[in-house]
C-alpha cells in the first residue's frame, strides 16, 4: 500500500531490516549519496554487500571500459555498471545466500553543478534486481535533471530519488503507476525532473513504457517524453544531441494525406537550407497533452497508443509534451540541440501565433515570446490553406493586424518564415475532423484520404470509432475479389 508520508530514512531502514534484499551500490561522478542514506539509517549490514565510488575517469574506464564518444553520463555506461556489479554479486554470493536473498545492483552516473554553475546537471540511475530468491532479474532505469542551484542540494536530491527507486522496485512493483509516483516522494519538480523511465524484465512484461512516459508528463515530472520510430522510449537530450529537428505538431487523429504532403514538401525545403546536414535530421511528430484530451478532458490511453503506433509505422519519432505555446516548445528544443530546428505548420497555426492575447501574461508580450520562438537557429515552414472561394491562403496574402505587419515582414525577409511550395492542391480540402467523422460513420472513401498503410491499420484494429460492420463488409469484398481472381 502506497504511503506518501514515508520518509527517506524510514524507507532505507525498512529495506535494511528486510533480510531478503541484498546487493551492491556503484556510484560514479557526483552521485555519491544513495548508499550513504542506507548507512545513516542503521542496519546497513543487512542490505549492503559492497559500495563503490569511481570518481576518477581513469579508474572508471579501467573498471567499466571506455564509452564510444568518450561520454560518461550516458545510459550505456549505466547498463555496464549494473550488469557488472550484479554479476559480481551473483558470482560471489549465490552459493552462500542465493536461496534466501533477492540480489540487486544499484548504480548511477551523474554530472552535478560545476563550481562556475555553467553546466547541465543530469544523471542516469538504475536498479537491476530479483523479486524472488533465485528468480530472473528486472531493470528500472530513469534519467533525471537536477534543478537545485547548490551542489550539496543536488547530491541530497539524488540520494533521495535513489532510495525511492529502490523502495519502489521492491515494495510497489505490482503497481508500476504507484512505483512511478513514489519516485518523487520527499522531492518536488523544482528540485528534480524525471524525463525518462524504462521498465524491463520478466516481471514487467505487461508494462507499456510509452504509457509510463505519458504519465511522467501527466504527473508534471517532466514537460516532454520521446519515442523512437520503433516505439521504444528515448531520453530526449541523448537522442537529439547534435541533431537537426524537423517537427510537426497536431492532433493527428488520424494523420491524413494533407499531413503527408506537408511533411514531404516541408522536409524537402528544410534539407535545402545551407546550414542543414541531411545525415543529422530527425523528423518528430508532436502531440500535446491538450491535443490528447478527449471531450471530457481525460486522456484516452488506448487512443494515445494507437496514434503513436500509426506515426511510428510511418518512421516518425513521436514526442508528447506539455508545451502548449510554441515559444515554450522552442525554448525546450533549443536546450536539446544547438543545430537548426524547423517547425512545420499550417497557416491557421501561424495565425494563432500572431494572436497577442496568448502572451498577455508575459512582461514583454508578443515580442518576448518571439525572441524565444524565432531564435537564431529556428525557421517556420507554412503550409497554405484552401479558402471557401477556392483561393489559397499563404504568407503572400497573410492577414495580420496593421501594427504587427512590420514584425511579420521582418521575419519573412530575414528567412524565419517561409511558405511550403509545390503543395498538392488536391489534398488541401482534407481536414482531420472531416476524416474522423467519415471514419466514425463508416462512410465509404475515408480510406482514400489517409496513407494506405494508415488505412490498413485503422481497419485491422477498428481505430478511431470505425464501425465493426464496416470492417466486416470491407473484408467480405476482399474475399469476393480474391475468389473472382481464382
PLM segments and residue spans:
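Nucleotidyltransferase catalytic core that binds NTPs
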Residues: 1-486
Amino acid at each position: 500500500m502506497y504511503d506518501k508520508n514515508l520518509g527517506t530514512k524510514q524507507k532505507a531502514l525498512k529495506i535494511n531490516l528486510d533480510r531478503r534484499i541484498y546487493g551492491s551500490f556503484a556510484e560514479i561522478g557526483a552521485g555519491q549519496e544513495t548508499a550513504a542514506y542506507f548507512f545513516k539509517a542503521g542496519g546497513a549490514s543487512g542490505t549492503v554487500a559492497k559500495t563503490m565510488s569511481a570518481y576518477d575517469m581513469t579508474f572508471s574506464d579501467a573498471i567499466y571500459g571506455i564509452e564510444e564518444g568518450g561520454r560518461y553520463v550516458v545510459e550505456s555506461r549505466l547498463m555496464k555498471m549494473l550488469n557488472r556489479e550484479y554479476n559480481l554479486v551473483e558470482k560471489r554470493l549465490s552459493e552462500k545466500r542465493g536461496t534466501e536473498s533477492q540480489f540487486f545492483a544499484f548504480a548511477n552516473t551523474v554530472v552535478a553543478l560545476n563550481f562556475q554553475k555553467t553546466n547541465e546537471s543530469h544523471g542516469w540511475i538504475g536498479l537491476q534486481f530479483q523479486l524472488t530468491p533465485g528468480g530472473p532479474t528486472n531493470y528500472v532505469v530513469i534519467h533525471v535533471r537536477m534543478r537545485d542551484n547548490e551542489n550539496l542540494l543536488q547530491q541530497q536530491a539524488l540520494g533521495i530519488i535513489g532510495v525511492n527507486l529502490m523502495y519502489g522496485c521492491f515494495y510497489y512493483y505490482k503497481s508500476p503507476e504507484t512505483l512511478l509516483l513514489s519516485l518523487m516522494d520527499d522531492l518536488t519538480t523544482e528540485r528534480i525532473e524525471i524525463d525518462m523511465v524504462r521498465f524491463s524484465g520478466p516481471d514487467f512484461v505487461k508494462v507499456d513504457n510509452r504509457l509510463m512516459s505519458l504519465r511522467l508528463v501527466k504527473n508534471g515530472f517532466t514537460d516532454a517524453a520521446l519515442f523512437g520510430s520503433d516505439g521504444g522510449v528515448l531520453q530526449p537530450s541523448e537522442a537529439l544531441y547534435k541533431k537537426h529537428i524537423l517537427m510537426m505538431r497536431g492532433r493527428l487523429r488520424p494523420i491524413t494525406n494533407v499531413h503527408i504532403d506537408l511533411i514531404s514538401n516541408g522536409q524537402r525545403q528544410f534539407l535545402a537550407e545551407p546550414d542543414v546536414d541531411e545525415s543529422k535530421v530527425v523528423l518528430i511528430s508532436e502531440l500535446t497533452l491538450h491535443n490528447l484530451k478527449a471531450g471530457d478532458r481525460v486522456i484516452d490511453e488506448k487512443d494515445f497508443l494507437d496514434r503513436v503506433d500509426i506515426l511510428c509505422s510511418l518512421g516518425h519519432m513521436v514526442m508528447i509534451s506539455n508545451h502548449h505555446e510554441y515559444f515554450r516548445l522552442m525554448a525546450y528544443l533549443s536546450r536539446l540541440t544547438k543545430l537548426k530546428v524547423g517547425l512545420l505548420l499550417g497557416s491557421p497555426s501561424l495565425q494563432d501565433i500572431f494572436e497577442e492575447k496568448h502572451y498577455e501574461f508575459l512582461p514583454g508580450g508578443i515580442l518576448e515570446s518571439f525572441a524565444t520562438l524565432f531564435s537564431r537557429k529556428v525557421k517556420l515552414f507554412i503550409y497554405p490553406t484552401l479558402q471557401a472561394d477556392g483561393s489559397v491562403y499563404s504568407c503572400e496574402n497573410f492577414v495580420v493586424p496593421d501594427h504587427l505587419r512590420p514584425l511579420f515582414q521582418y521575419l519573412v525577409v530575414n528567412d524565419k518564415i517561409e511558405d511550403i511550395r509545390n503543395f498538392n492542391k488536391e489534398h488541401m480540402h482534407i481536414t482531420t475532423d472531416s476524416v474522423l467523422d467519415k471514419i466514425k460513420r463508416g462512410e465509404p472513401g475515408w480510406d482514400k484520404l489517409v496513407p494506405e498503410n494508415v488505412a490498413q491499420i485503422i481497419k485491422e484494429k477498428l481505430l478511431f470509432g470505425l464501425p465493426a460492420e464496416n470492417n466486416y463488409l470491407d473484408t467480405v469484398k476482399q474475399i469476393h475479389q480474391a475468389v473472382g481472381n481464382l
